[in-house]
Amino acid sequence: MAETEKERLLKQLAQLKNERTSFESHWLDLSDFINPRGSRFLTSDVNRDDRRNTKIVDPTGSMAQRILSSGMMSGITSPARPWFKLATPDPDMMDYGPVKIWLEVVQRRMNEVFNKSNLYQSLPVMYASLGTFGTGAMAVMEDDQDVIRTMPFPIGSYYLANSPRGSVDTCIRQFSMTVRQMVQEFGLDNVSTSVKGMWENGTYETWVEVNHCITPNVNRDSGKMDSKNKPYRSVYFESGGDSDKLLRESGFDEFPILAPRWEVNGEDVYASSCPGMLALGQVKALQVEQKRKAQLIDKATNPPMVAPTSLKNQRVSLLPGDVTYLDVISGQDGFKPAYLVNPNTADLLADIQDTRQTINSAYFVDLFMMLQNINTRSMPVEAVIEMKEEKLLMLGPVLERLNDEALNPLIDRVFSIMARKNMLPEPPDVLQGMPLRIEYISVMAQAQKSIGLTSLSQTVGFIGQLAQFKPEALDKLDVDQAIDAFSEMSGVSPTVIVPQEQVQGIREERAKQAQAAQAMAMGQAAAQGAKTLSETQTSDPSALTAIANAAGAPQQ
């Protein structure tokens, strides 16, 4: 009997499960000690409120993860300020007014879609998973109400595979849906016989395991435009139930899963290193140290006691101010601690603080909390800015990978969805068929460009100082180019800078006005001179009369 499509998908799922097995023990440790609620290795864990933080005594690792997630959110994709802009591959085209305006309008509309959707609720969750487990995943789906709808996946609930380029192009997610949700989403005719029976019996809230498989559609017919022949194939199917029944088969024009990795080794699908993995050993050591400190204090304040046998079955009190009576017999020491504990916790506290600092360094806490931890009031503003820029550069490699594996696909996906929904204005003719370039202008992206800004500012300042003694030094500075370069590196809105052709028109008009004013001034001066000559008295001897007489005398 031929293999059904569902059986083939289940076989692929089993292979991906086997590939992921070696990572799971590490992820479980990270989950137990840093982010207990950030994983889901069993679909049956849905809506389970079991206590999971039993291995955490000191939550320094968990708080460091929170700071990293919040810092990346505010520093990379802050909803409070623009963090990306669209540009053309040809920089000269950016000086063309209609292109500038169109790109600005598109960027503003995309930001409105981001703010309206739940994107900014999902990104911190993905950043937390990325920092602790090294791998994050989030789906970006079309939505009739908010244009897009995002859903972050907990670690352990999905399986990934790479394309030949090394980027993720396959994702199978396992999750749970209630019988009611399945019937509402897929229809009663598409669910399995067992789910249909539960629906008819009224057990609407029973959970059923569902799989969602997204893979490249290698067998598609590119000449057809239906959902089953799109570049990426999407299939929903139950783990159990009928062996030949799929819940839904459709497709995507773009890969809808964002799957950034912190650091990847070779051909690995999942991350090989991240702050959580670096800090895990210290996080475990910190729990032991905190237990030892508590035991030390406990033994000092409530020590084990020794007593003579005469006190056996007698009333003994350890309450403050209470009295225990006993007969002291020669050779007996009475009722006393078994051993004296000197609670000198200074060395232990110093080691605990050192361990905490190591954990915070692994999570870049010192970077995100720099202005809070350092007294910057006594420092020059330039020194504070340079220190901040230097620390932000430490995240440079991670930021580049995040751009490539998460932010670029996110913007491409949302742009395409908005284009299909006719939410974008008609582009200028010069942009027809031209790919756009994405530039990031977030706080961290600006830190990467700050070296160029500083160099440009220093160069312009140097030329200005020279011009005080040698004004012709300004001839060496192209002011228009300096303004354009500075505004581009600063991330200023393109509409703030006047296009070059408009500047040229303004200058030509100003030159014409200056010429007209000069001609008018010369005309007025000539008229005034003629008037003066006409009013001059020639009866008295003067130079003027001499000239006039000489001009009128007959020539010999």
From Swiss-Prot:
It is found in: Virion. Keywords: Capsid protein, Viral capsid assembly, Viral genome ejection through host cell envelope, Viral genome packaging, Viral penetration into host cytoplasm, Viral release from host cell, Viral short tail ejection system, Virion, Virus entry into host cell. Homododecamer. Disulfide bonds: none annotated. Pfam families: Head-tail_con. Residues 527-556 are annotated as: Disordered. Its main location: virion. InterPro entries: Connector_podovirus. The lineage of its organism: Viruses, Duplodnaviria, Heunggongvirae, Uroviricota, Caudoviricetes. Residues 533-542 have a biased composition (Polar residues). This is Portal protein. Belongs to the podoviridae head-to-tail connector protein family. It comes from the Viruses. Forms the portal vertex of the capsid. This portal plays critical roles in head assembly, genome packaging, neck/tail attachment, and genome ejection. The portal protein multimerizes as a single ring-shaped homododecamer arranged around a central channel. One of its GO terms (cellular component) is viral capsid.
